[in-house]
Amino acid sequence: MRKIVLLLALALLLPAWPAFAQGQFRVLVLAVPNRYHHDYTVVAKPRVEKMARQHGFDLDWSWNTAPFDGDLSAYAAIMLLNTPGDALAQGQRGALEAYVRAGGGVVAVHRALIFNPPGDWPWFERMIGRAFRIHPMVQTATVRIEDASFPATFGLPARWIWSDEWYEFGPPLVDGLRTVLSVDESSYDPTRIWPGQVARGMGREHPVAWYHAYDGGRVFVTALGHPPAAYDDAAYLQHLYGGLWWAATGRGISATSD
């Protein structure tokens, strides 16, 4: 009995163990519902929360931009989940810039790649790396791995059948973009679009996911993620976590590609 009491007393004197009581890093997910992207949240929130439990990281989920009025330094990465930069007010935009310049990581998912109006926040557009042009209707296509050394590709087949909105982009806005995944335009119809709109595709080089170092931080971008069912797909969630892991830690890139 005396031994148990002694052990309890010693335990009270010991400092807390945050590395065990808390996750390996902390992530903020910004998921502001918008006109075309709101149904996905019912699926995405519990699945991303499960991802956090599975991989042992702390997660804060926000439906609004209020966290950008406070201190972002506790976050190893910020995920802009179908939430574009124009959702942020001017002061909040400055907070994101300061966060990245201090070494923070950003994961931009699908709708986050579209900024309206174009040219209103050049820093954010350069962070994304490419300017969105248009997309055809949702179709099934073949996705190719372009960089098997990057963790957002780990576990994916060399040719992956996926259904999504295949965003088209202009040329790179910055140097150093590393393409992770591309879509094979011969596997779908890039011109299948709504009346009054024109889509032509991008040709052989049609990136749909990439990463780069930007203004002191790490940025992973994936154009995939429109269908709500995507967030219930194990392969897609592995793709998403691989990019998040790198953005948060800088780890995971293999020395060689298989």
Task: List the model feature ranges, each with a label.
Residues R26-P33, H37-F115:
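Helical hinge/lid and interdomain linker segments adjacent to catalytic or ligand-binding clefts
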Residues L7-A16:
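Bacterial N-terminal signal peptides
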Residues M1-I4:
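Positively charged n-region of N-terminal signal peptides that target proteins for export
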Residues W17-A21:
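Sec/Tat signal peptide C-region and signal peptidase I cleavage site
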Residues Q22-R26, A31, D39, K50-Q54, ...:
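Extracellular ligand-binding/catalytic regions of CAZymes and related secreted enzymes
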Residues R133-D215:
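Catalytic beta-strand/loop cores that center a nucleophilic Ser/Cys/Thr
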Residues D86-A158:
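A glycine-rich, often tryptophan-bearing local segment used as a flexible ligand/cofactor-contacting loop or short
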Residues G103-V107, V180, F220:
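Structural detector of well-ordered beta-strand residues that form the stable sheet scaffold
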